[in-house]
Swiss-Prot record:
Biological role stated in the UniProt entry: Acts as a sulfur carrier required for 2-thiolation of mcm(5)S(2)U at tRNA wobble positions of cytosolic tRNA(Lys), tRNA(Glu) and tRNA(Gln). Serves as sulfur donor in tRNA 2-thiolation reaction by being thiocarboxylated (-COSH) at its C-terminus by MOCS3. The sulfur is then transferred to tRNA to form 2-thiolation of mcm(5)S(2)U. Also acts as a ubiquitin-like protein (UBL) that is covalently conjugated via an isopeptide bond to lysine residues of target proteins such as Prx2/Jafrac1, Ciao1, Eip71CD and GILT1.
Family: Belongs to the URM1 family.
Site of covalent link Glycyl lysine isopeptide (Gly-Lys) (interchain with K-? in acceptor proteins): 101
Protein name, entry field: Ubiquitin-related modifier 1 homolog
Gene that produces this protein: Urm1
Length: 101
């Protein structure tokens, strides 16, 4: 048997995609041997796919205020935020509410 995999979908909307190479949807296959929380995922995203101005997406170890996070269409605040443990086929959507004027 091969290494266990954790497949999830990341989506970016309302300008958040501009920080990730202008790609609105990514299907990820993560190492299923480790526990993946949103906190781990954010660190992975910063190291691997965040291409532009990380200060507009991250503040410390979390997303900055103004970035909404939905996990399977549910506000992450209802699911434990950074401590939420990712499950197979989870859909994680990041929506930017930060807009210049």
């Amino acid at each position: 048997m091969g290494t266990p995999e954790l497949k999830i979908i990341l989506e970016f909307s309302a300008g958040a995609e501009l920080l990730f190479g202008n790609i609105k949807r990514r299907e990820l296959v993560l190492d299923g041997n480790q526990k993946w929380t949103i906190a781990n995922l954010l660190k992975w995203m910063h190291a691997n796919i965040l291409t532009e101005r990380p200060e507009l997406f991250l503040q410390g170890d979390t997303v900055r205020p103004g970035i909404l996070v939905l996990i399977n269409d549910t506000d992450w605040e209802l699911l434990g935020e950074l401590d939420y443990e990712l499950q197979p086929n989870d859909n994680v959507l990041f929506i930017s509410t930060l807009h210049g004027g």
